[in-house]
Swiss-Prot record:
The keyword Lipid biosynthesis applies. It comes from Pseudomonas fluorescens (strain Pf0-1). This is UDP-4-amino-4-deoxy-L-arabinose--oxoglutarate aminotransferase. The lineage of its organism: Bacteria, Pseudomonadati, Pseudomonadota, Gammaproteobacteria, Pseudomonadales. It catalyses: UDP-4-amino-4-deoxy-beta-L-arabinose + 2-oxoglutarate = UDP-beta-L-threo-pentopyranos-4-ulose + L-glutamate. Transmembrane segments: none annotated. Catalyzes the conversion of UDP-4-keto-arabinose (UDP-Ara4O) to UDP-4-amino-4-deoxy-L-arabinose (UDP-L-Ara4N). The modified arabinose is attached to lipid A and is required for resistance to polymyxin and cationic antimicrobial peptides. The keyword Protein transport does not apply. It comes from the Bacteria.
């Protein structure tokens, strides 16, 4: 009998999450309401930030954060190309220019030195990425940003539970976390913006809901007049309480979820040692890795096959994979606008990286199945 297909990711949803959704559905208040408020308060406390704003996606959060910081035509925003395309898309849609920097070949994260070389008088923001669950080296970055007076937005989409030198990432400034279906904590779709800047938090909160000073639940609970005024034109990026209810349960489980991810990643590192596949390196500064993804680099000279053949080989054995990510500057729209941009280490990884299964409900037997399949492809097992 053939084994069931093993996806590269699967959300860990149990009876508690289902009960939480049912409670909201029966409450009569299913859109933004008390669950959002509780989620914001608890997430801010978990991270160590003064303010948190829940939104419907990290893309929407990035959009209104950039807008709230005044990013617009003529401005430049520095970010690695080795990230999801939504960051550059939001920069571009505001009329600003994404300035792509290269990454370290083995961690897939950039650093303060590469960023400093890209700073110009037009630079208005820097967006570092905590990649695959690892923490970006923040101290040199914030020293650089303070020196030049440039805003920092930490892209923490992969980093719920990640810590840097004992502090949760995002607690030093402004950050955006994703609750997408494959993330360490999920609510299907959703995000959290965190900051210690009250004025920035207030503007993000306003922009996420039409530019109004209040939402429907705010009016209900505080008795404000229903004729809310537009302070400035905004968007519709609020999170429904159905989603927030799931996220609240996931937040309670997050440390346990990440502990299991760490167990699995540790097994992978041990059992894949000696094979020609190349896992990402763990940065050598103090941090707590959340292991959002387990990424291999499949180099044809080392492995005897390219990434596409490797992924096809795992697919034929009933194992799913992913690519995180094709470098942004290689996408058609961005390549047309910067045809000569060369980022060698980004491009080397973009052509070779492959995410293999890693999710908290995986069993040790699932992991051994993946390792065995890789050994088979590498000629180490019949």
């Amino acid at each position: 009998m053939s084994q069931a297909f093993l996806p590269f990711s699967r959300p860990s949803i149990g009876d508690e999450e289902i009960a939480a959704v049912e409670q909201v559905l029966r409450s009569g208040w299913i859109t933004t309401g008390p669950k959002n408020q509780a989620l914001e308060e608890q997430f801010a406390q978990y991270v160590g930030s003064r303010h948190a704003v829940a939104l419907s996606s990290a893309t929407g959060a990035m959009h209104v954060t950039l807008l709230a910081l005044g990013i617009g035509p003529g401005d430049e925003v520095i970010t690695p190309s080795q990230t999801w395309v939504s960051t550059a898309n939001m920069i571009s849609l505001l009329g600003a220019t994404p300035v792509f920097v290269d990454v370290d070949r083995d961690t897939l994260m950039t650093d303060a030195a590469r960023i400093e070389a890209a700073i110009t008088p037009r630079t208005k923001a820097i967006i570092p990425v905590h990649y695959a669950g690892a923490a970006f080296d923040l101290d040199p970055l914030y020293a650089l940003a303070d020196k030049h007076g440039i805003a920092v937005i930490e892209d923490a989409a992969h980093a719920a539970g990640t810590r840097y030198k004992g502090r949760h990432v995002g607690s030093q400034g402004t950050a955006i976390f994703s609750f997408h279906a494959i993330k360490n904590m999920t609510c299907a779709e959703g995000a959290m913006f965190v900051t210690d800047d009250e004025a920035l938090a207030n503007r993000v909160r306003m922009l996420k809901f039409h530019g109004l000073g209040v939402d429907a639940y705010d009016r209900l609970t505080h008795g404000r007049k229903p004729q809310a005024q537009v302070i400035e034109p905004g968007f519709k990026y609020n999170l429904a309480d159905i989603n927030a209810a799931i996220a609240l349960v996931q937040l309670e489980r997050l440390d346990a979820i990440n502990a299991r991810r760490t167990e699995l990643a540790t097994q992978y590192l041990q059992k894949l040692e000696g094979l020609p596949v190349q896992p990402l390196a763990v940065p050598n500064y103090p941090q707590q890795h959340a292991w959002h993804l387990f990424i291999l680099r499949i180099d044809s000279e080392r492995c005897g096959m390219d990434r596409e053949a490797f992924m096809k080989g795992l697919q034929e054995q009933g194992i799913g994979t992913g690519i995180h990510f094709i470098a942004t500057h290689l996408h058609t729209w961005y390549r047309q606008r910067a045809p000569h941009l060369s980022l060698p280490d980004t491009e080397w990884n973009s052509a070779r990286l492959c995410s293999i299964p890693l999710f908290p409900d995986m069993t040790d037997q699932d992991l051994d199945r993946v390792v065995g399949a890789i050994e088979h492809l590498m000629g180490k097992r019949p």
